Swiss-Prot record:
Domain observations: The hydrophobic-rich region (HR-A/B) corresponds to the oligomerization domain. AHA motifs are transcriptional activator elements.
Coiled coil: 166-224
Disulfide bonds: none
Ranges where the record places region Disordered: 144-170
Name of the molecule in the record: Heat stress transcription factor A-3
Amino acid sequence: MSPKKDAVSKPTPISVPVSRRSDIPGSLYVDTDMGFSGSPLPMPLDILQGNPIPPFLSKTFDLVDDPTLDPVISWGLTGASFVVWDPLEFARIILPRNFKHNNFSSFVRQLNTYGFRKIDTDKWEFANEAFLRGKKHLLKNIHRRRSPQSNQTCCSSTSQSQGSPTEVGGEIEKLRKERRALMEEMVELQQQSRGTARHVDTVNQRLKAAEQRQKQLLSFLAKLFQNRGFLERLKNFKGKEKGGALGLEKARKKFIKHHQQPQDSPTGGEVVKYEADDWERLLMYDEETENTKGLGGMTSSDPKGKNLMYPSEEEMSKPDYLMSFPSPEGLIKQEETTWSMGFDTTIPSFSNTDAWGNTMDYNDVSEFGFAAETTSDGLPDVCWEQFAAGITETGFNWPTGDDDDNTPMNDP
């Protein structure tokens, strides 16, 4: 061998750690310690330890800490609060860029949910115990407030989970009873509502019927007063009514004066209503009185024929007297003496409301249930019949002639 070859040194072999088998006999595990046991282990980041900082708080801290935004938002004098100097500019530029909205009121509400409070009434200055200048790591101590509803829900769920089965069963039974009572009340209210609806329908139908009758009455009155013949008859009837009322008042006064009793009588001077049993006695008394007056004061001239009711014996002996009939004047005199025969002093007054009060629209017969024939003047015959029947009941015999001097209104 040459000496040069012997002088070349061989490279030192690299020692590689070899895994050793476990010293435990029968163990299948292999010791994988590759010689790195002496190196330090990696530690987690500080941000991962504890509660994470909410993004809203971190963004707000960065905005307040940015010196370029001091004209809009900056720290307070002590560094324990921040001030929004220009809310309009803050809502127009900064909020859309960082919070994706431009509502300053929403930003303030968000601050309130994290416990910030407004410390100055003249400006928008907010403060929190953990929001301090240069101490961003304290933001993890700020927590979001929970709503009262969520707290109540949590408490109720906890109490329910802790309740015994007996209490839960009693609560369920109580809820069932309340539900049953509510259902019964609801059914009762529904029945009342239906009854009220039916009552309202009935009232509406009655109102419609009343309105229909009123319209029919108005239309009948309009047609009635357009009839000239009816208006003329009504005018004549009113004139006769005034005179008749005056005559009836005179007759009533005469009856009261004729039957007035002395003050010492048991009735005390009041007007006595005689019954039918006293008719004959009163009639005989009145005839004697009138005969005495007629015989004493009758003259040879009798223009109105008032002596026909009580003639003398000479006239009664004449044969022509039995064949004659008294004139209307005699009938009127007879009516005056009728008051002394015990009839009731109540005399019906025939005003236009009594004579014409029952007039109806005879064109609509089905509404009132009967029909009546009308005269050529358009006035129902039943009105004139009612008027004539009322006069007949009082005993008056009205003359049919055109001479108004024979009416009882002109009798002195």
